[in-house]
Amino acid sequence: MESENILEAKQVSVAFRIAGKFQKAIYDIDLSLRRGEVLAIVGESGSGKSTLATAVMGLHNPNQTQITGSILLDEEEVIGKTGDSMASIRGSKVGMIFQNPLTALNPLMKIGQQIKEMLAVHDVYPENQYESRIFQLLEQVGIPNPKRVVNQFPHQLSGGMRQRVMIAIAIANDPDLIIADEPTTALDVTIQAQILDLILEIQKKKNAGVILITHDLGVVAEVADTVAVMYAGQLVEKASVEELFQNPKHPYTRSLLRSNPSAETVSDDLYVIPGSVPSLSEIEYDKDLFLARVPWMKEEAQKVISEKMTEISSNHFVRGQAWKKFEFPDQKLKGGKK
């Protein structure tokens, strides 16, 4: 019987070798993704979002990285797999759309060759169908005149066209999971919308699971089913998109949402989250990492110990108890939300 979950990650930690010793970049991550679900992972730069994605893809250097825990992809364990054993999974069961297609694509290979290479690694399609499959993929992602594009190099295409090629490569072998790592960051607004619509169209057609890594909360509200918030390598909150936007609990989640401008913003000054994400050498995972960054909560931060994620309501998980103590300064003065 086919499992409902395409991805199950349990107690996943990733550590990088830095100056001769391993330092954890992400710690104790538990996540699952159902077929047909869109999971958005949000957080500032340095929160560990892409590190988690590359762990799922098996893209870390095993000599410089330690990965512990369990990552089941379609019920198959991927932690510990390297070389050909991981290559057989990457591209067939999971495909990844990278942030910058200009650096992700090979500048010395024509577009058609790059898609053919992805098909040749796996046995999903026979060799005599490669050419027709390449044209089919390029048409599917909305590229006009595929016969011309297959003979072009990446630099000859626009940014939007290159990202469409990246999507074609990612879905070439019909993976059950698509990871989109900031797929629209380098594109203008109108092209961003087209690319997001394309990803969702493919997801619905194939009933694939999608992990969308982004810092754009507007995009999250529009396309996600579930949201996972990461901070300094930890998952701090996870809930349905409706629940998270209407009833955020963790101080970091609330700060992210408050700093996001909207049409309803009436204050002259936008809220700015104080400080910055700590470096790997500064992280103490037994402390509440975000409270230590907030000036008016530093004293409280010393008393709050970081705890595991707990379910505070149906499918709404929050790390620790800090959310019960956190208030914005103006809330203390006015006794309520601004």
UniProtKB/Swiss-Prot annotation:
Keywords of the record: ATP-binding, Cell membrane, Membrane, Nucleotide-binding, Peptide transport, Plasmid, Protein transport, Translocase, Transport
Compartments in which it is found: Cell membrane
Residue ranges annotated for the ABC transporter domain, each copy included: 7-257
GO molecular function annotation: ATP binding; ATP hydrolysis activity
Any GO BP annotation: protein transport
Enzyme Commission identifier(s): 7.4.2.6
Catalytic activity: a [peptide](out) + ATP + H2O = a [peptide](in) + ADP + phosphate + H(+)
Taxonomic superkingdom: Bacteria
Binding-site list for ATP: 43-50
Biological role stated in the UniProt entry: Part of the ABC transporter complex OppABCDF involved in the uptake of oligopeptides. Probably responsible for energy coupling to the transport system. Essential for uptake of peptides larger than three amino acids and for growth in milk.
Family, similarity comment: Belongs to the ABC transporter superfamily.
Subunit structure as annotated in this protein's UniProt entry: The complex is composed of two ATP-binding proteins (OppD and OppF), two transmembrane proteins (OppB and OppC) and a solute-binding protein (OppA).
PANTHER family: DIPEPTIDE TRANSPORT ATP-BINDING PROTEIN DPPD, OLIGOPEPTIDE TRANSPORT ATP-BINDING PROTEIN APPD
Entry protein name: Oligopeptide transport ATP-binding protein OppD
Protein species of origin: Lactococcus lactis subsp. cremoris (strain SK11)
